From Swiss-Prot:
<keyword id="KW-0378">Hydrolase</keyword>
<dbReference type="GO" id="GO:0009368">
    <property type="term" value="C:endopeptidase Clp complex"/>
</dbReference>
<dbReference type="GO" id="GO:0006515">
    <property type="term" value="P:protein quality control for misfolded or incompletely synthesized proteins"/>
</dbReference>
<comment type="subunit">
    <text>Fourteen ClpP subunits assemble into 2 heptameric rings which stack back to back to give a disk-like structure with a central cavity, resembling the structure of eukaryotic proteasomes.</text>
</comment>
<dbReference type="InterPro" id="IPR018215">
    <property type="entry name" value="ClpP_Ser_AS"/>
</dbReference>
<comment type="function">
    <text>Cleaves peptides in various proteins in a process that requires ATP hydrolysis. Has a chymotrypsin-like activity. Plays a major role in the degradation of misfolded proteins.</text>
</comment>
<dbReference type="GO" id="GO:0005737">
    <property type="term" value="C:cytoplasm"/>
</dbReference>
<dbReference type="InterPro" id="IPR001907">
    <property type="entry name" value="ClpP"/>
</dbReference>
<dbReference type="InterPro" id="IPR023562">
    <property type="entry name" value="ClpP/TepA"/>
</dbReference>
<dbReference type="Pfam" id="PF00574">
    <property type="entry name" value="CLP_protease"/>
</dbReference>
<dbReference type="GO" id="GO:0051117">
    <property type="term" value="F:ATPase binding"/>
</dbReference>
<keyword id="KW-0720">Serine protease</keyword>
<comment type="similarity">
    <text>Belongs to the peptidase S14 family.</text>
</comment>
<feature type="active site">
    <location>
        <position position="122"/>
    </location>
</feature>
<dbReference type="InterPro" id="IPR029045">
    <property type="entry name" value="ClpP/crotonase-like_dom_sf"/>
</dbReference>
<protein>
    <recommendedName>
        <fullName>ATP-dependent Clp protease proteolytic subunit</fullName>
        <ecNumber>3.4.21.92</ecNumber>
    </recommendedName>
</protein>
<dbReference type="GO" id="GO:0004176">
    <property type="term" value="F:ATP-dependent peptidase activity"/>
</dbReference>
């Protein structure tokens, strides 16, 4: 993948950055694509770096993801809850599966979606082959993960656990407005204001 380079004028001349490093200067982390261990490690490292720089200043996590590996996503989620710096989440494009859980895990009042973004929740997917006993062990693990993910989603949204369990039985798609009603996000952003805020 080609990563754009941006050039900035500084007192010492020109300086070039890859686009993600430049965004990081403004405390912006971009999660684009499926969540796996490699992506999770990059996102976590950036969060820890920004936390060390200023633990009181917001971190902005932009999400455009179809989801991915549950344990990788939970590593990001737990780091969001662990650090002191508030993490604002913004859905651009889509936040599906683990992406939706991460979106809901942002600081309350600072979870956003762009106008035409799509949000989708569902139960975790899994596949395993091998001996019958091992298949049974993995099936039990998936059921435990499903229960925990539903509990987290219920806690983050304010929905009853029974409703979340019913809604995640199959793919459950939402618009930004529907995700706001559900409690996954707090507001829909249409454009940045000149002062850097949103409206």
């Amino acid at each position: 993948m080609l990563v754009p380079i941006v050039v900035e004028q500084t007192g010492r001349g020109e300086r070039s950055y890859d686009i993600y490093s430049r965004l990081l200067k403004d405390r912006i982390i971009f999660l684009g694509g499926p969540v796996d261990d490699h992506v999770a490690n990059l996102v976590i490292a950036q969060m820890l770096f920004l936390e060390a720089e200023d633990p009181d200043k917001d971190i902005h996590l932009y999400i455009n993801s179809p989801g991915g590996v549950v344990t990788s996503g939970m590593a990001i989620y737990d780091t969001m809850q662990y650090i002191k710096a508030p993490v604002s989440t913004i859905c651009v494009g889509q936040a599906a599966s683990m992406g939706a859980l991460l979106l809901s895990g942002g600081e309350k009042g600072k979870r956003f979606s762009l106008k035409h973004s799509r949000i989708m929740i569902h139960q975790p997917l899994g596949g395993f082959q091998g001996q019958a006993t091992d298949i049974h062990i993995h099936a039990q693990e998936i059921l435990k993960l499903k229960k925990r993910l539903n509990e987290i989603l219920a806690e983050n949204t304010g929905q009853q656990l029974a409703k979340v369990e019913a809604d995640t039985e199959r793919d459950y798609f939402m618009s930004g407005a529907e995700a706001k009603d559900y409690g996954i996000i707090d507001n829909i952003i249409e454009r940045n204001t000149p002062s850097g805020g949103t409206r």
